[in-house]
Design a protein with these regions (language model features):
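Intrinsically disordered, Ser/Thr-rich regulatory regions of eukaryotic membrane-trafficking proteins
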Residues: 1-412
Length: 412
């Protein structure tokens, strides 16, 4: 598989950047010019070039604010929502340099230099789409969800985050373990899920830096005025991020971190034990369940696990990368519709209105089965071995939803 993202200036066609992941060859300037030329030719004839199919893949063009055109190319059978990927990349560009600067394009060379700061996040984002990168620490799933860990310590950590944020006169704090969201401050829900994902990505790409500050523009709340995001490494693979003003200085923040978090070292270590299972041990899963994706539709958070059982149990012969790929493909192509709210607009019949009453969907193949069911704000997508009867599969999914929704150790 391979995925490629190209950014060009809409009017001049000057390449801004190109980033790729996978086994595709490096993109040549002539190829970039040809791809952009196709889009410009269509515009000259009042046509909209949406996407096109190529051998074992597709290409998508998206123009933003008449200043930048993003081109996405996915090949090798990768199930990737290119439109969502390009939208995320555009938000990342705003996140890095601000909407006003991106829309004006006064100095392309300067913009190209400024956008280099977003390359680590962009590369991280592209690598996270690769199901073969099972040894990578990057969370691997879908672009419209915030991958999380559910652990009993979340409420204690939320109180600590509130205290830490208040000490810095900041807002919107979160704690991540292995790049997955574990706990947030009380006001974190004010952020648009797209902004929350970008902040989590920023924390996940710190490369071990103990303390770092980064100017960020929140695409929905403040696209033109920068905030200051301060990221601190507490333990190995454990980071806290808070959005605050110009003060206090980093040297003072170092002291505040010690004061606020010194007493929570054991709590954080206990929370780390939940990884890579990502669910409390009080929740048990049937041996025939090979993997699970749990989605909270209220806050766009999800929990994914392919390590549901003890390590001494048999793995049923399915590689971990294959489980990831199956569950993601199942969610993107079928189960995602269960997570959406379909509302008719202005009395007109929505084209997806017939899905309003649907609460489950099933996939059956020769080697595995997938079943998804929604109950309230929770959507459970489960991967089963092919020998499990369909009626048993439905009963198990329903029981998992009930166990998860009533478990008192789960705090979103």
């Amino acid at each position: 598989m391979s995925v490629l993202v190209i950014a060009v200036a809409t009017e001049s066609g000057v390449p801004i950047f190109s980033r790729k992941r996978g086994n595709s060859e490096n993109i040549q300037f002539s190829t970039i010019a040809s791809l952009h030329g196709i889009n410009m030719f269509s515009k000259c004839h009042n046509l909209l070039m949406v996407n096109t199919q190529v051998d074992n893949g597709n290409i998508l063009w998206k123009e933003y604010s008449k200043s930048v055109t993003l081109i996405g190319v996915a090949t090798g059978g990768l199930e990737c929502d290119l439109e969502l990927l390009l939208s995320t990349v555009h938000n990342l560009m705003i996140f890095s340099i601000g909407k006003k600067e991106l829309d004006s394009f006064k100095n392309i060379d300067q913009i190209k230099r400024d956008l280099r700061q977003c390359y680590p996040i962009l590369d991280y984002l592209l690598e996270s789409l690769d199901p073969e990168a099972v040894l990578s620490p990057h969370p691997t799933l879908v672009l419209d969800l915030i991958q999380s860990i559910l652990c009993p310590q979340a409420q204690q950590l939320q109180q600590a985050l509130d205290n830490y944020s208040e000490s810095l006169t900041g807002r919107w704090a979160c704690l991540s373990i292995h790049g997955r969201l574990v706990a947030t401050s009380s006001d974190f829900g004010e952020l648009d899920p797209r902004e929350a994902r970008l902040l989590l990505l920023l924390a996940a790409t710190q490369d071990g830096a103990p303390l770092r500050e980064t100017p960020v523009y929140l695409p929905q709340i403040s696209p033109n005025v920068a905030f200051r995001a301060v990221t601190c490494k507490l333990l190995a693979d454990v980071y806290i991020l808070v959005v605050c003003g110009a003060t206090p200085a980093l040297s003072q923040i170092d002291e505040i971190v010690l004061q606020c978090w010194e007493g929570f070292a054991q709590v954080i270590k206990d929370a780390k034990v939940a990884y890579p299972r990502n669910f409390p041990m009080s929740i048990s899963f049937e041996p025939c369940v090979l993997g699970i994706l749990l989605v909270n539709t209220n806050n766009q958070r999800c929990v994914f696990s392919r390590h549901l059982h003890a390590t001494n149990q048999k793995s049923r012969g399915m590689p971990g990368a294959h489980k990831v790929d199956i569950l993601r493909t199942f969610y993107v192509t079928a189960a995602r519709e269960l997570a959406r709210e379909h509302k008719s607009r202005g009395g007109e019949k929505d084209e997806l209105e017939e899905l309003d009453g649907m609460c489950e969907v099933t996939w059956v193949s020769e080697y595995h089965k997938c079943h998804a069911r929604r109950a309230g704000n929770l959507l459970c997508c489960a991967l089963y071995s092919s020998s499990v009867p369909s009626h048993t599969m439905r009963l198990i999914t329903n029981q998992m939803l009930q166990d998860i929704s009533t478990n008192k150790e789960i705090h979103w």
